[in-house]
Regions:
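Jelly-roll (double-stranded beta-helix
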Residues: 1-271
Length: 271
């Protein structure tokens, strides 16, 4: 498909992150049926500071290179007149503007803020002798959140390593994972297109039996996108309608006596 904007056309392909700066008039023209995960940020999406030197150049240990970031390719001429509807997002709502000219009708542009794409397959995976924690796969950062990419990679290579995530609690962040493609070895009941949300403070980790099953594995074939936020996430009505109540019980063996509790906010907590 192609995001069109005042900066020109910017084709994307499967696996692309498409970053569109705030204040950019744009529209997305997809080609066929597609599945997207969309993050809306109140500020800039940036390359993590630890990947850059004091001048902003990517360091040699960074998991990608500046040539992996792609700018718009073609600035087309738009001369058509008539009503053109532009939806402007203002905080928690929208305003509608009707222009008598095409919103992308520009002669040219100059500067350093423009849409760009980065493909998840260009992310060089992070590996180690023992298990690397999820934040080591950080790809971007934004105000009060980070984006991480899980890609096919060699697993932990210490002879006594258990090559699967350990049980943990995120005390200061909410963990949302979008499962893009491949085989997800630490989860049961997950398929391509699934989204999981683990709230802060709730212990989670591999499903029963998967740690033992992982022993001897040398590589993983998965693509997933994780968003860790440092403020609590709220479920929308649509998200609640799509919730799979069986997921929270998937850590329990039969007969463990797990129960569900409805809290005053109307969100089901599984105990």
């Amino acid at each position: 498909g192609t995001p069109e904007s005042i900066f020109g056309d910017h084709p994307y392909k499967q696996g692309d992150y498409a970053v569109i700066p705030r204040g950019t008039p744009y529209r997305v023209v997809p080609e066929g049926e597609q599945r997207h995960v969309v993050f809306t940020s109140p500020g800039l999406i940036e390359i993590p500071r630890r990947y850059r030197n004091e001048y902003g150049q990517l360091l040699e240990h960074a998991p990608y290179y500046h040539r992996d970031l792609h700018a718009p390719t073609e600035l087309r001429t738009h001369t058509d007149r008539g009503e053109h509807v532009v939806k402007l997002r203002i905080k928690d709502g929208f305003q509608t503007y009707v222009l008598d000219y095409h919103p992308f009708d520009v002669v040219g542009w100059d500067g350093y803020v423009y849409p760009w794409t980065f493909n998840i397959r260009d992310f060089e995976p992070i590996t180690g002798r023992i298990h690397m924690p999820p934040p080591s796969h950080q790809t971007f950062q934004g105000p009060n959140f980070v984006i991480c990419s899980f890609c096919p990679r060699k697993l932990d290579f210490d002879p006594e390593a258990i090559p699967i995530p350990y049980h943990h609690s995120n005390l200061n962040s909410e963990e949302m994972i979008y499962y893009v493609d491949g085989n997800f070895s630490s989860r049961k009941g997950i398929e391509v297109g699934s989204v999981t949300l683990h709230p802060s403070g709730i212990p989670h980790g591999p499903h029963p039996g998967l740690a033992e099953k992982s022993i001897g594995l040398t590589e993983t074939h998965e693509y997933a996108v994780m968003c860790d936020t440092f403020h609590p996430l709220r479920l929308s009505a649509l998200a609640r309608d799509l919730d799979d109540p069986a997921y929270a019980y998937s850590w329990f063996e039969a007969g463990d006596g797990a129960t569900a509790h409805e809290d005053p906010a109307g969100v089901t907590s599984h105990l």
